[in-house]
């Protein structure tokens, strides 16, 4: 079982000064207000009501922290960080200004941040605001993994096209950097439970969770095994 299944609500933050003063790694989740971010977090953590989605898109304007640790552990091993959904027009100007500042400052300056999970609707990837998020985070040199959500809404051929075009866009961004930045993408569907294990593996690796260490050890052991002898020899 993934340790992500043990995630628990930790704190809600409305100002950078209130961020947890911890040194453990964090993975942030970002995306448009209607990209299915809260639903995806709940699915990845195998919980129904860990991350709440507002009935009115764009109303969740805080940063929510979820701790990841075994049930009886005294301290978190890591944090999942649910960032405010962006891009919804009904938010007032002053709230939007504060919200955008909170988002940009967090992703650009948070030293504990190990990587960004960027959620995009597979039908409408790379909106202007999605591109803005990539451009804010890219200079940090940390990895970005795109979840193309709501893949169940598309045909197989349209999904393949969306994934191909997304990877091409990410490659274009990566080529702008002097030092290579890991940028990957996958298809994801909360409804069809598609892509869950792949996404969990990425997150566990970034957070250096025990399950990722075990998977790495198994992979190393398999690579070190001598090839099977040819029966003909």
Swiss-Prot record:
Question: Does this entry carry the keyword Metal-binding?
Answer: yes
For this UniProt record, the keywords arranged alphabetically read as follows: Cell cycle, Cell division, GTP-binding, Magnesium, Metal-binding, Nucleotide-binding, Septation
Q: Which GO terms describe its cellular component?
A: cytosol
The Gene Ontology terms for molecular function here are: GTP binding; metal ion binding
- Cofactor or coenzyme needed: Mg(2+)
Q: Which residues bind Mg(2+)?
A: 38, 60
Residue stretches of biased makeup (Basic and acidic residues):
214-225
GO process annotations (BP): division septum assembly
- Record-linked InterPro entries: G_ENGB_dom, GTP-bd, GTP-bd_ribosome_bio_YsxC, P-loop_NTPase
One Pfam family named in its UniProt record? MMR_HSR1
Keyword Metal-binding (UniProt):
yes
Q: Where does GTP bind?
A: 31-38, 58-62, 82-85, 149-152, 187-190
Region annotation Disordered: where it falls in the sequence = 214-233
Where is the EngB-type G domain positioned along the sequence?
A: 23-209
PANTHER family found in the cross-reference section: ENGB-TYPE G DOMAIN-CONTAINING PROTEIN, MSS1/TRME-RELATED GTP-BINDING PROTEIN
Role summary: Necessary for normal cell division and for the maintenance of normal septation.
What family does the entry list? Answer: Belongs to the TRAFAC class TrmE-Era-EngA-EngB-Septin-like GTPase superfamily. EngB GTPase family.
Protein name, as recorded: Probable GTP-binding protein EngB
Origin species, per record, is Cupriavidus necator (strain ATCC 17699 / DSM 428 / KCTC 22496 / NCIMB 10442 / H16 / Stanier 337)
